[in-house]
Amino acid sequence: MKYQQLENLESGWKWKYLVKKHREGELITRYVEASAAQEAVNLLLALENEPVRVNVWIDRHMNPALLNRMKQTIRARRKRHFNAEHQHTRKKSIDLEFMVWQRLAGLAQRRGKTLSETIVQLIEDAEHKEKYATQMTTLKQDLQALLGKK
C-alpha cells in the first residue's frame, strides 16, 4: 500500500460519504424494512463525532452493494490527501470553456500525451516562438544598422 491509512480521518470520510449517499436518496443500510433502515441511519447520524464507532456501524448495518464504491472513494480521497502535502504532487484545477477543453483534449489525443503534458508543450512552443521572434527582430535591427552605416 502506497498511502498510510489513518483510521480516525478515514472514518470521518466514511461517515460523510454515507450521510451524503443517504441524503441523495440511496439505500445505505442492508435492511429492506423502512423502520429498521431509518433506525440504523439515525444511529449513524448520532456517530458524527465518534469515528471509531462508524466502522462498527459499517460492519453491522451498511448495504454490501455500497462497500466497493465506498472503498474506491476513500482510496481516492486518501491519495488526494497525501498528494496535497507536497507541492509537486498537489493537483490544481483550472476553469476551461467546454470548446477550449475539447480542442485541448483532441490535441492531446493526437499527440498521444496527457492534458498536462500537452499544456506544457504548448507553453514551451510559445516560449520558443517568442525567443525566435526576439532573435529575428534583433537580427533585423543589426542588419539595418550595418547597411545604414555604409
UniProtKB/Swiss-Prot annotation:
Where does this one sit in the cell? Cytoplasm
Question: Single GO cellular component annotation?
Answer: cytoplasm
Stored Gene3D superfamilies: MatP, N-terminal domain, Met repressor-like
* Domain of life the protein comes from: Bacteria
Q: What does this protein do?
A: Required for spatial organization of the terminus region of the chromosome (Ter macrodomain) during the cell cycle. Prevents early segregation of duplicated Ter macrodomains during cell division. Binds specifically to matS, which is a 13 bp signature motif repeated within the Ter macrodomain.
According to the record's subunit comment, the protein's assembly and interactions are: Homodimer.
In alphabetical order, the GO MF annotations are:
sequence-specific DNA binding
Protein's GO biological process: cell division; regulation of DNA-templated transcription
**Name the record gives this protein:** Macrodomain Ter protein
- InterPro entries per UniProt: Arc_rbn_hlx_hlx, MatP, MatP_C, MatP_N, MatP_N_sf
User: What is one Pfam family matched by this protein?
Assistant: MatP_C
Which keywords fit this entry according to its UniProt record?
Cell cycle, Cell division, Cytoplasm, DNA-binding
Q: Which gene encodes it?
A: matP
* Similarity comment: Belongs to the MatP family.
